[in-house]
């Protein structure tokens, strides 16, 4: 399940993020990579324990908790503190094919999560850089993702993925992981489809429609059956 989530941040918020990030110090992005990923990773990253990363990351989490599409798709239990990276053409930055670590731990908070879902939030407009596509592989093939600034993509952390070399400009983004209340990706996808159908039905017929009420009850009972909290 690969889901695009538009307008997580407004254009004004993106501009503010970029001002703060441009004024911050950056470090080698391999500092947060696993052993295998570090061999194919070349980019820069805001220090995860730095004030800028922590403050901006919390703002992203706050925005996501107000986003109905995200909540419906992810059914999040825990969200890992967002990280921030930059790929520049002058360095030949890229990130080769890899899979994310199954478990992530935050040394500052002690939080440990199972990485069910990964998210990339784009913070540079696609016409400001060449290359830098996020390529995600699944059972249906390869998908290239390059979204407007402020938009995000959500995908299973079990997916092989890569960032192609940046050949002009700079690709700036936030990336992070989350543990879902619904461990099984297939079940989570069906829950999302059901919720989407319920929302469409209630828009047409109203929330008091008997079928909409019944389906909403089924949705919550399925969450009750499958959720791990």
From Swiss-Prot:
Cofactor binding summary note: Binds 1 Fe(2+) ion per subunit.
Chain ranges of the Fe2OG dioxygenase domain: 78-180
One of the protein's GO biological processes: DNA damage response
Alphabetically ordered keywords of this record: Dioxygenase, Iron, Metal-binding, Oxidoreductase, Vitamin C
Cofactor or coenzyme needed: Fe(2+); L-ascorbate
PROSITE patterns xrefs: FE2OG_OXY
InterPro entries: Oxoglu/Fe-dep_dioxygenase_dom, PKHD_C, PKHD_hydroxylase, Pro_4_hyd_alph, Pro_4_hyd_alph_FE2OG_OXY
Gene3D superfamilies in UniProt: q2cbj1_9rhob like domain (2.60.120.620), Rabenosyn, Rab binding domain (4.10.860.20)
A Pfam family per the record: 2OG-FeII_Oxy_3
Residues holding 2-oxoglutarate: 171
Top-level enzyme category: oxidoreductase
Claim: Oxidoreductase is one of the keywords in the record: yes
E.C. code: 1.14.11.-
Domain of life (superkingdom): Bacteria
Keyword Oxidoreductase: yes
UniProt: Fe cation binding residues: 98, 100, 161
Protein name: PKHD-type hydroxylase BBta_3541
């Amino acid at each position: 399940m690969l889901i695009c989530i538009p307008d997580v941040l407004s254009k004004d918020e993106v501009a503010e993020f970029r001002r703060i990030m441009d004024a911050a110090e950056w470090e080698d992005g391999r500092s947060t990579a696993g052993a295998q990923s570090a061999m194919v990773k070349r980019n820069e990253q805001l220090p995860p324990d730095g004030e800028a990363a922590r403050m901006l990351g919390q703002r992203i989490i706050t925005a996501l908790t107000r986003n109905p599409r995200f909540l419906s798709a992810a059914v999040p239990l825990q969200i890992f503190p967002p990280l921030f990276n930059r790929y520049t053409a002058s360095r030949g930055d890229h990130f080769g094919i890899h899979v994310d670590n199954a478990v992530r731990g935050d040394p500052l908070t002690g939080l440990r999560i199972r990485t069910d879902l990964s998210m990339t939030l784009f913070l540079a407009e696609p016409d400001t850089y060449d290359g830098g596509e996020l390529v995600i592989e699944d059972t249906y093939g390869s998908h290239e993702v390059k979204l407007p600034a402020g938009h995000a993509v959500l995908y299973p952390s079990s997916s092989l993925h890569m960032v192609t070399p940046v050949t002009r400009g700079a690709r700036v983004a936030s990336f992070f992981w989350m543990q879902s209340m619904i461990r099984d990706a297939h079940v989570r996808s069906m829950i999302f489809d059901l919720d989407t159908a319920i929302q469409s039905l209630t828009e047409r017929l109203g929330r008091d429609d008997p079928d909409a009420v019944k389906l909403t009850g089924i949705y919550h009972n399925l969450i009750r059956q499958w959720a791990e909290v």
